[in-house]
Amino acid sequence: MKQTDDKDSLLNRLLLSLGILLFIRMGTFLPVPGIDHGHLEFYIERHFRLRTLVSTFAGDNTVVVGLFTLNIFPYINASIIMQLLVSLLPGLSKLQKEGGAEARRSINSLTRLLTLGWSLIQSTSVAFYLKRALFEWNLVLAFEIVIWLTTGAMIVLWLSEIITEYGLGNGPSLLIYTNIVSSLPGFVKQVITESSGKVPIGSWLLSGFVLFVALYGIVLLQEGMRKVYLISSKQLNQTSLPFSGSSNLESGYYIPLRFNQAGVMPIILTTAVLVIPTFIYNLGLLRILTPLITLPVFVKSYKIIYWVSYFVLILLFSLFYSTIVVNPKDLSDELQKMAVSIPGIRPGVETTFYLKQVMKRVTLLGAIMLALLATLPNIIQAILSLSGFTNLGTTSLLILVGVILDLTREMRSIILSNIYYDMFD
């Protein structure tokens, strides 16, 4: 966090972030030239899949293909791909660990290039998907749509980096947060419309309790950690380790192994994997299985099979992705270099083994909590017989809670820095 002479730095940062978010939100509704949006809206009202495609990026029920329609999603996808490449390619992994600031700049540049490539892919998909909806569609119009949407995505990336650097909060996270929040009025309206006069008060109270438990569980999942205490060779407790993010003058240094190291990635990967069979079937490649999947037994047990698979895949992806985020071997090597060890555990192989065992237990607990929380929207839907609750998934709640917690921490940091500045001014 940069120290600033301006005592109103918190307000300035907040206004900058809000201004950029408002500008991006307005740009989402700035129509791309060449598209007859009146005809497009008429077509979309009758084709649910196209409505879903167009409204996915904007975060609500808009039917406008705007300059910032792609929003920050190309960058999010590029970041995920980059994380996987760093974990799979030894050269990139070594560059990230040993390259310092210059390496971070190189990886950021590669991520931006991936963002550009992914923007081209997504904008091309949108352009060709609109072919059936636009009478005036041609290759020139498709090219213009691709250029507009790709340019818009890169502008959004640039503005999000300005928020991260000079504003309040993390730019990409705030943009996703804004998209989710913008869809909440429609979600509330849908729930009220579907439930009016149909749902008993007891079901509402039970669902409210389940939602409260879900929010509490998400906060616990986001903030919960297992502290692995450390001891330095010189027995000094005045400063914390660079990677610990915290220190305790009574108990010494510690490594915070969080319950949910992988964030929402296990849910994203699980959803992507479970969509693949349906996608392949719709292409006509698995038509031979039609007699099997139309059996009454399969139809009745389909939801059970789906959610058991959902639960198991989240467990597996959580265990896998957590090893990418925190590698016990790398952590052990760093401790050895800094002449720091875990009390009662020998440095080297024994420390690596100990960290692996602790991480397995912590990650398994976090994965079980994440999988249980992921099924809660469906529990509420079953109680109320409403389809609207599936639109407010665990991923959205995790992002909402995570962004709020991050903003709270950053605001506290700015306030404390200003207090210290006043003390020594």
UniProtKB/Swiss-Prot annotation:
Q: What does this protein do?
A: The central subunit of the protein translocation channel SecYE. Consists of two halves formed by TMs 1-5 and 6-10. These two domains form a lateral gate at the front which open onto the bilayer between TMs 2 and 7, and are clamped together by SecE at the back. The channel is closed by both a pore ring composed of hydrophobic SecY resides and a short helix (helix 2A) on the extracellular side of the membrane which forms a plug.
**Protein family (similarity comment):** Belongs to the SecY/SEC61-alpha family.
- Output the InterPro entries linked to this UniProt entry: SecY, SecY/SEC61-alpha, SecY_CS, SecY_dom_sf
Q: Which UniProt keywords apply?
A: Chloroplast, Membrane, Plastid, Protein transport, Thylakoid, Translocation, Transmembrane, Transmembrane helix, Transport
Cellular component (GO) terms are:
chloroplast thylakoid membrane
Cross-referenced SUPFAM superfamilies, in alphabetical order? Answer: Preprotein translocase SecY subunit (SSF103491)
Question: How is this protein named in the record?
Answer: Protein translocase subunit SecY
* Residue ranges crossing the lipid bilayer per the database entry: 15-35, 62-82, 113-131, 139-159, 168-188, 201-221, 266-286, 304-324, 364-384, 385-405
List localization entries.
Answer: Plastid, Chloroplast thylakoid membrane
Q: Which GO terms describe its biological process?
A: intracellular protein transmembrane transport; protein targeting
Write the gene name. Answer: secY
In the UniProt record, the signal sequence range is none
**Thylakoid listed as a keyword:** yes
Stored HAMAP family: SecY
Q: Spell out the subunit comment.
A: Component of the plastid Sec protein translocase complex, which is composed of at least SecY, SecE and SecG.
